[in-house]
Amino acid sequence: MMGLFPYSSGYRIQSDRKVAICSVHPSEQATLQCLGCVKAKIPVAKSYHCSPKCFSDAWQHHRVLHERAASAVNENGNEEEEIFGRFNSTGSGVNTSLTSLQSSGSLTNGTTPLYPVAVTQRNGGETWFEVGRSKTYTPSADDIGHVLKFECAVIDVETKLPVGHASTVLTSRVIPAPSPTPRRLISVSGVDIPVHLDLDSCLSSSGTFTVLSYNILSDAYATNELYSYCPSWALSWTYRRQNLLREIVGYRADIVCLQEVQSDHFEEFFAPELDKHGYQALFKRKTAEVYSGNINTVDGCATFFRRDRFAHVKKYEVEFNKAAQSLTEALVPSAQKKTALSRLVKDNIALIVVLEAKFNNQGVDNPGKRQLVCVANTHVNVHQELKDVKLWQVHTLLKGLEKIAASAEIPMLVCGDFNSVPGSAPHALLAMAKVDPMHPDLAVDPLSILRPATKLMHQLPLVSAYSSFARMPAVRGLEKQRRRMDPSTNEPLFTNCTRDFIGTRDYIFYSADSLTVESLLELLDEESLRKDTALPSPEWSSDHIALLAEFRCKPRTRR
């Protein structure tokens, strides 16, 4: 409208009583504070915890912050963000760094008030501080524990006075971003990798490399109906994407395999953001659109690799829809083709990438020969009643990988969300290279695509990386991880944890004749996750957990 313009401003309310929020569980009020963080001048919001157990569980993270602050006194206040999520060393003793917060007292660090004192506005007995004059505002550390007010008014150009009443919106109290308990990288021999180690130089000199597999939960599936136990703000994509990125970058994996990555999120967020951290990106979208018909909501598999560690050689895209059409044309009678296609066409895909290592390793038989690695990243159909479709998709992928393996001596990595629990036919095919003809899953085969059962086999010597935990002797340092494994299957007790389901659906398989597992990312325990009912939560932004394995290429035997 001519002669008028909008004017926006933001304010923070100053209360007499300060409210501290737990840095790990932001829905909880803090009752304890880490004095070590206060003395180290780490941002005070990161020092609060809701219970002694909460603090104890996060103690390794605090130790790292204290050590880094002590060795780099000139570091800025974002130090803890830089090492968020990295692997931490073991330690004990937390009581000396803990103090209780009295609910009636003012929270300070001993010398300086927690919040600023410049008054800019007083309304109705409340004191407000102006924090911005733009259409958008990102809360800062100073805002934690406070209510914010956003005000928008229409101003007359000539008089510079408001026209009518300003529109005002009040927020809930600002809470700090949660700090998930750091996960350690544990050697399968039981020796943890120290956090102060320079992981980059370690990997380059030793010839090992790390692979991460993670279903990040597509925004299209992250609905309030499915995950009503997760606060809406923690379920929003604007929040989850930053939390996921921080977690993924913190693992510093050489190869990253993500599932349920939406097309628009890949192009507009993950690819450019991970590029800043030295990753090259490849993506394969599923072959159909989800819910709205908007092509941007279609999810797929994304594979990233560090440019300083690997070079891209070749990419293969597996569309199970096309394979289903070929199978139907070749084997299914004409009268059943429509029914067969309806059952088999489920839009799942796999992305296969061949990479060349840039680091020295002992896997090559002469210094001038390059080391190749083949990485498959897939997301198998989710419907539990389609057992035949799941098995057929996994079998189709493995037969394709067999052809690649036959063309060159190349280590294989098969990562992803297989939507198949340990002991299922797809898992048996992956882990045992065959399926027992009497397996109960084979009873579901209305199209007879799994017969004879003897054809359900492959020649790849695949082993589940996390089964290394179960195979190791009960040495000190591994007991906790062994308790998080299922001894009957040699797989984790769970990689997917929701209110209605808990179990393992994600795996990293490797070719045992050419690779050996050096270390594994520790597993999470169900008790800690159930504090927030299940996943996703403010702490962990997917309903799956990330898996990571460190590998070394075995020396090749000359033929």
Question: Where does each model-flagged region fall?
Answer:
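Structured beta-strand-rich core segments of catalytic domains in phosphoester-bond hydrolases
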Residues: 180-208, 255-381, 386, 456-459, ...
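Ser/Thr/Pro/Gly-rich low-complexity disordered regions
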Residues: 1-48, 52-207
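Eukaryotic serine/proline-rich intrinsically disordered regulatory segments
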Residues: 65-119, 179-184, 291, 319-340, ...
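Metal-dependent phosphoester-hydrolase catalytic domains
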Residues: 309, 345, 359-365, 385-388, ...
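Acidic/histidine-rich helix-loop elements
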Residues: 217-238, 326-330, 343, 384
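Active-site beta-strand/loop signature of hydrolases that rely on acidic residues for catalysis
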Residues: 211-217, 240-270, 352-353, 374-378, ...
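Amphipathic alpha-helical interaction motifs in eukaryotic regulatory proteins
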Residues: 23, 35-38, 50-51, 55, ...
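Hydrophobic beta-strand positions in extracellular immunoglobulin-like domains
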Residues: 152-154, 355, 551
